[in-house]
């Protein structure tokens, strides 16, 4: 019986395959076989025995493991018994503890997951950077506190998001060495069962798996690395939600500047035929909150008794799997949304013009200061003019033209030029181009 939405609604097939039960067991078998090969290299068993065991070990099924676990109440020992049953090899699991297998197999899953996330983060950063260049001269209304602010450009907005996503790409690279480690260190981390062979056996196992050995561990690898990973996913999810949220704000009927793609046969509402709801962005916002919610239980799972207890185990079966699958889901969704987004240039211009020049009050204030008026005095003159414009439902220009304190410094045509949004963009264009160059360099 399927009860979890990840099974039937959320997540990509490629990521769900990595975290499936069958995949987990196959990776744990792979770790056990790497241990046998390392033991063979040290002479505990013959190379031939290790090779023969490997041929048969992958016939172990989740169903058989569950049958044994139902009887003995221990999942890893059930796996060990199933492998021993399939291979006939008496050296299976020699010197190892359960989490030597679990944590090392998890590192393999995380490595494969990071490969997928890395490609998609790169893709999203590139799409955002391309949009930034495409829209670098599309002047729009900037908003702070939800209210009209200075003009900006859509290219600037997309460049801001592109830079943020590119920083996540950098963080992912930096995290790999700390996260992608395995262990073969025994019950309390001392490698006692291996004697003086411990370092060499562990290093050989990790070489075969293309992992690095943990510098030190108890019965388990310290969970600070898992905490860092979930914090990374939470941080990524926050960025994705921020982009999606702003897309939703800009799609509101009274704004109408931007629109996520709406398919020809797509239905927006079961009762309102006209609706074109931003469901992809809403989906991202909802699931991003779930991803961030896994950070706290993972932090709690890092706090264990002495050499370890089992309180982390049940939680991590959920936190690692669901956070990874859902983060990949919303990342995939945002690539789709950003790639196909469209701008309504008419509405963008309309929203600028609706401000009647009030959002350019700073531009006039700055120019007045340059022409000899004290900055604070100029601020008050412009504030008073703006308040009159609100009260009279007039334009800022109308009020300024009637104010002698202003007009002794300006001609009318000068004010008109100052109050053109495209004339007050500072280094917006250059900053967009700088960001795009940097993003492309990061993603090389």
From Swiss-Prot:
GO BP terms: 'de novo' AMP biosynthetic process; 'de novo' IMP biosynthetic process
Catalytic reaction(s) noted: N(6)-(1,2-dicarboxyethyl)-AMP = fumarate + AMP; (2S)-2-[5-amino-1-(5-phospho-beta-D-ribosyl)imidazole-4-carboxamido]succinate = 5-amino-1-(5-phospho-beta-D-ribosyl)imidazole-4-carboxamide + fumarate
Record's keyword annotation contains Lipoprotein: no
Chain positions recorded as N(6)-(1,2-dicarboxyethyl)-AMP binding sites: 9-10, 73-75, 97-98, 219, 270, 275-277, 283, 314-318
Record-listed E.C. numbers: 4.3.2.2
InterPro entries for the chain: AdenyloSucc_lyase_C (IPR019468), Fumarase/histidase_N (IPR024083), Fumarate_lyase_CS (IPR020557), Fumarate_lyase_fam (IPR000362), Fumarate_lyase_N (IPR022761), L-Aspartase-like (IPR008948), Pur_lyase (IPR004769)
Pathway named in the protein's UniProt entry: Purine metabolism; AMP biosynthesis via de novo pathway; AMP from IMP: step 2/2; Purine metabolism; IMP biosynthesis via de novo pathway; 5-amino-1-(5-phospho-D-ribosyl)imidazole-4-carboxamide from 5-amino-1-(5-phospho-D-ribosyl)imidazole-4-carboxylate: step 2/2
GO cellular component: cytosol
Keywords: Lyase, Purine biosynthesis
Record keyword Glycoprotein present: no
Gene Ontology MF term list: (S)-2-(5-amino-1-(5-phospho-D-ribosyl)imidazole-4-carboxamido) succinate lyase (fumarate-forming) activity; N6-(1,2-dicarboxyethyl)AMP AMP-lyase (fumarate-forming) activity
CDD domains: Adenylsuccinate_lyase_1 (cd01360)
Catalytic residue list: 145, 269
Function: Catalyzes two reactions in de novo purine nucleotide biosynthesis. Catalyzes the breakdown of 5-aminoimidazole- (N-succinylocarboxamide) ribotide (SAICAR or 2-[5-amino-1-(5-phospho-beta-D-ribosyl)imidazole-4-carboxamido]succinate) to 5-aminoimidazole-4-carboxamide ribotide (AICAR or 5-amino-1-(5-phospho-beta-D-ribosyl)imidazole-4-carboxamide) and fumarate, and of adenylosuccinate (ADS or N(6)-(1,2-dicarboxyethyl)-AMP) to adenosine monophosphate (AMP) and fumarate.
Family of this protein: Belongs to the lyase 1 family. Adenylosuccinate lyase subfamily.
Subunit annotation: Homotetramer. Residues from neighboring subunits contribute catalytic and substrate-binding residues to each active site.
Name assigned to this protein: Adenylosuccinate lyase
Species in which this protein is naturally found: Archaeoglobus fulgidus (strain ATCC 49558 / DSM 4304 / JCM 9628 / NBRC 100126 / VC-16)
